[in-house]
């Protein structure tokens, strides 16, 4: 048996896009190009179905596995029309699995879903008997994690078994054949420095959608020296998190530790004047700022920049045993993005930084982060 693997990935610190191209067969593999006619495609993040062309890379009758929390009603709502139409018109065998839910139930956690999806792959690909594949995966898990104790091994075994058992085949509706093409979700910048806005709209949006090869040479005429403007990651708004933090002001002690530990500056404290608080978007929660009666305090979250790591909620001391941050479903929390967008445009409050000192955790977090959305 011969095999060839190529892994295409971006430079993001967390939650980046990785595309794994795998070929195998009984003859030597001499292909020097990426796979564009696959027998099997799996999407491990449900937000990607609107951002990238994936099912279009399948041969007729191929298999598509989507990791998502949706039932049939959810699929109708979230799958873009071009995906529905391709699945229906090309006889694609469509399966779904809720890897995040399985990860939580088996103790692996919401982000460690690779083992679960790998088990589902072996069930659907029918390369080797399912029972044999599960046994081999279990043996590999024991060899890899045996030193960490039997508890870790058992969690991996449970995830492997659940991954194979909880795959659900989707009965594709006839109506999907006529679904309208909705296009890919691409970033469009309007506000900000002209050089950054032009770069995002001309190049970055296409490249981020894995459509960079379609750009003409003329698109790069302003960047012939290889330079690119800084600060453009703020426009990406990837929306890759499954769960994001939601702030409960009643339990907040305004320590700013959550902002301090966030690697992506996706959760920020903000000081608002009475006028700024009055003009804030409807529903934005504010509270009196401790030690500065002229200001209101708010903790704002950029759901579309958050990676869902949960570090902020973990470090939050809360009040009387109740945390001020809870990780909740991204879809339900996305409406709070407007609070973040409003807050980050407010002028800096130098007197607030002076009051709490820039060399303290609390004071430093009122300053502009210099590393964001990475």
What is the role of each PLM region?
Residues 133-134, 146-305, 313-374:
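Ferredoxin-type iron-sulfur electron-transfer modules and their immediate structural context
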Residues 1, 108-120, 254, 259-260, ...:
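Conserved phosphate/anionic-ligand binding catalytic regions in large, soluble enzymes, centered on
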Residues 1-207, 277-283, 352:
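Active-site cofactor/cluster-binding pocket
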């Amino acid at each position: 048996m011969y095999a060839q693997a190529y892994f295409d990935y971006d430079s993001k610190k967390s939650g980046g896009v990785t595309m794994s191209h795998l070929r195998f067969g009984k003859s030597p593999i001499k292909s020097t190009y990426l796979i564009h006619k696959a027998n099997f495609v799996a999407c491990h993040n449900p937000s990607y179905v609107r951002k990238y062309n994936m099912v279009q890379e399948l041969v007729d009758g191929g298999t598509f596995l989507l990791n998502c929390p949706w039932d049939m009603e959810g699929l109708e709502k979230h799958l873009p029309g071009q995906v529905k139409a391709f699945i229906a018109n090309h006889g694609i065998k469509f399966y779904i699995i809720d890897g995040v839910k399985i990860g939580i139930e088996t103790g692996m956690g919401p982000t460690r879903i690779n083992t679960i999806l790998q088990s589902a792959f072996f069930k659907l690909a029918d390369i080797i008997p399912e029972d044999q594949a599960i046994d081999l995966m279990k043996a590999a898990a024991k060899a890899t994690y045996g030193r960490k104790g039997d508890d870790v091994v058992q969690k991996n075994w449970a995830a492997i078994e659940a991954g194979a058992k909880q795959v659900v085949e989707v009965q594709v509706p006839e109506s999907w054949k006529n679904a309208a093409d909705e296009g890919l979700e691409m970033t469009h910048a309007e506000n900000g420095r002209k050089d950054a806005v032009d770069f995002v709209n001309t190049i970055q949006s296409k490249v981020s959608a894995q459509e960079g090869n379609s750009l003409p040479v003329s698109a790069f005429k302003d960047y012939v020296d290889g330079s690119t403007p800084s600060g453009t990651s703020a426009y990406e708004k990837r929306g890759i998190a499954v769960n994001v933090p939601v702030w409960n002001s009643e339990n907040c002690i305004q320590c700013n530790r959550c902002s301090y530990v966030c690697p992506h500056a996706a959760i920020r404290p903000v000081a608002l004047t009475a006028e700024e608080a009055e003009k804030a978007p409807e529903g934005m929660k504010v509270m009196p700022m401790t030690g500065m009666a002229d200001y209101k305090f708010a903790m704002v979250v950029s759901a579309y920049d958050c990676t869902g790591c949960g570090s902020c909620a973990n470090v939050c001391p809360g009040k009387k045993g109740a945390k001020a941050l809870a990780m909740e479903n991204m879809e339900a929390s996305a409406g709070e993005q407007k609070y973040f967008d409003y807050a980050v445009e407010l002028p800096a409050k130098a007197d607030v930084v002076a009051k709490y000192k820039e060399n303290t955790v609390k004071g430093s977090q009122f300053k502009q982060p210099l590393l964001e959305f990475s």
